[in-house]
Amino acid sequence: MAAIESFDNIYLDLSKESGKSRFAENGLGWKPAGGGEAFTLDSSNIGGAQWSRAARGYEVKILLRSSGVVQLDGFHQEDYERLSKIFKNWYSVNLENKEHSLRGWNWGKAEFSKAELTFNVQNRPAFEIPYSEISNTNLAGRNEIAVEFAGNDGGKSNGHSGTGGKGKKASAGKDQLVEVRFYIPGTTTRKEAEGGEAGSDADEEEKNAVTLFYDTLIEKAEIGETAGDTIATFLDVLHLTPRGRFDIDMYDASFRLRGKTYDYKIQYDAIKKFMVLPKPDDLHFLLCIGLDPPLRQGQTRYPFVVMQFKADEEVTLDLNITEEELNGKYKDKLQSHYEQPLHQVVAYIFKGLANKKVTTPAKDFTTHRQQYGIKCSIKASEGFLYCLEKAFMFVPKPATYISYEQTQSITFSRVGGAVSALSTFDITVHMKNGAGSSQFSNINREDLKALEEFFKLKGLRVKNEIDDDTNLIAAALGDDDMASSDEEAVGPKADRGSADEDEESVDEDFQAESESDVAEEYDSNHESDGSGSEESDVDNRVDDEDEDMDDDEGEKRPKKKKKTA
């Protein structure tokens, strides 16, 4: 055999770009054809090899001694003999020829191996799932388990380090499989779940099959406690998004949310924003964690995790870290002992472990009640809007973050025809480049001026349609008053006279063209503008006569007879 064996057009770990693969006595390597980072694997780390049909021809799957899998796809059928000699002579490993099941059945047996989960149909593999591709698993029903896959890793060529350690596969396409569910009824033992002989140990306890599958997968895929030592744990923390109560386990590189139904494992690298927001009730604080990629629960995505803490809840906590780590890796980031309000402790630990800045509301804005949160709603969902230094933040659901840099303009408006139109208003935030808009409704009118001043302070374009509408309405009302003031004055007041007076007395001195108001007819002391002294004397005499007539009528008017049964 030659000192080096080369193969062209080979794909590493489902990568989109092909490359050249070279085998030598001390190991193997792969380099992309277009240039880039090369992958190498030492011969001492090769624990086994399998040959099978794959997407681009034939595939060599290399099982690593350090719990991992390397896939090389794109070989031709005639390469089998050549590769078999390479693995046998140089790596002392047999290249096992494995045939996949092509029956298309969706029922079979799951087998946990060292590096991957295999679904077998009639003792042949239908598909395999490397543990490194599994990001999370949850019990989705009574006999059902959901297995979630790792998302796009940001376009890296492969997830392996130079020594072939555990890592994600090549960057995925725009559309990719994100979840698979297994229905596992009945009971079983741990040995059966791992592919052992049933009944080999009489003392082996039977458990629910789906629960045992779940526990085994968590252990194999290193999800949860097996991912490392817990630095801190917070129990029964209320989460508004996703809704429920979760225990928070914080590790060196990730944290875990453990609930009754769902568990989430989140890398600190996925944290893009971290905010501490006081609720307007002065009793609670909200901790908002922005994630990219977002948290996924079935078909629902959660770009923000929103926790709620009581403002007066104190905690005493000692971190599970050594003095050496505290003075080295976490110097000036963490303390060994905390005795403070719970929300502050959680925020400090997240800041130290994730190395993220903690964002709080801007000091330049408060509501008319001297609060930072504005009560409002997005469509039918009520919540609170916070003005940060560089963005808006609406919580709890749907949690919405809008950067000032992406804001084109802001419009203040009032809902026409609404009963509360005079006491509330709406804010519409228009995004740049036609990215749409977001509307925040039912904001207290007393916060209008403070918001307008804050937006102008931040250099945002503001259009106040409320003032424009008010001016137009005032102008329209002013014209109507000028045009109909006389009619409105005479109309309703002319009917206030006495019926007896209308029938029995005629005002002979009334002039239709007179400008005097009807009030003059009843007010003896009223002086009509523009009338002479003679007209005043006449009016006074008429008033005196009317009074005398009223007195006479009062004396002559008989009493009403009482009805008798």
From Swiss-Prot:
Tell where it localizes: Nucleus; Chromosome
Disordered as annotated region, ranges: 151-173, 477-565
Q: Does the keyword Transcription apply?
A: yes
UniProt biased composition (Gly residues): 152-165
Segments passing through the bilayer: none
Supply the Gene3D superfamilies for this chain.
Answer: 2.30.29.150, Pleckstrin-homology domain (PH domain)/Phosphotyrosine-binding domain (PTB), Structure-specific recognition protein (SSRP1)
The UniProt entry's GO biological process terms, in alphabetical order, are:
DNA repair; DNA replication-dependent chromatin assembly; DNA-templated DNA replication; nucleosome organization; pericentric heterochromatin formation; positive regulation of RNA polymerase II transcription preinitiation complex assembly; silent mating-type cassette heterochromatin formation; subtelomeric heterochromatin formation
What does UniProt give as GO cellular component?
A: chromosome, telomeric region; FACT complex
* Keyword NAD included in the entry's annotation: no
> Which keywords, in A-to-Z order, does the entry hold?
Chromosome, DNA damage, DNA repair, DNA replication, Nucleus, Transcription, Transcription regulation
Its main localization is nucleus
Cross-referenced InterPro entries: PH-like_dom_sf, RTT106/SPT16-like_middle_dom, RTT106/SSRP1_HistChap/FACT, SSRP1-like_PH1, SSRP1/POB3, SSRP1/POB3_N, SSRP1_DD, SSRP1_sf
Q: Which GO terms describe its molecular function?
A: DNA binding; histone binding; nucleosome binding
Q: Where is the composition biased (Acidic residues)?
A: 478-489, 500-522, 532-553
Highest taxon above the source species: Eukaryota
Free-text function comment from the UniProt entry: Component of the FACT complex, a general chromatin factor that acts to reorganize nucleosomes. The FACT complex is involved in multiple processes that require DNA as a template such as mRNA elongation, DNA replication and DNA repair. During transcription elongation the FACT complex acts as a histone chaperone that both destabilizes and restores nucleosomal structure.
The UniProt subunit note reads as follows: Forms a stable heterodimer with ctc-2/spt16. The dimer of ctc-1 and ctc-2 weakly associates with multiple molecules of nhp-1/nhp6 to form the FACT complex.
The entry's other comment says: In contrast to the orthologous protein in animals and plants, this protein does not contain a HMG box DNA-binding domain. This function may instead be provided by the HMG box of the associated nhp-1 protein in the FACT complex of fungi.
Q: Which family does it belong to?
A: Belongs to the SSRP1 family.
Q: What is this protein called?
A: FACT complex subunit ctc-1
What organism is this sequence from?
Neurospora crassa (strain ATCC 24698 / 74-OR23-1A / CBS 708.71 / DSM 1257 / FGSC 987)
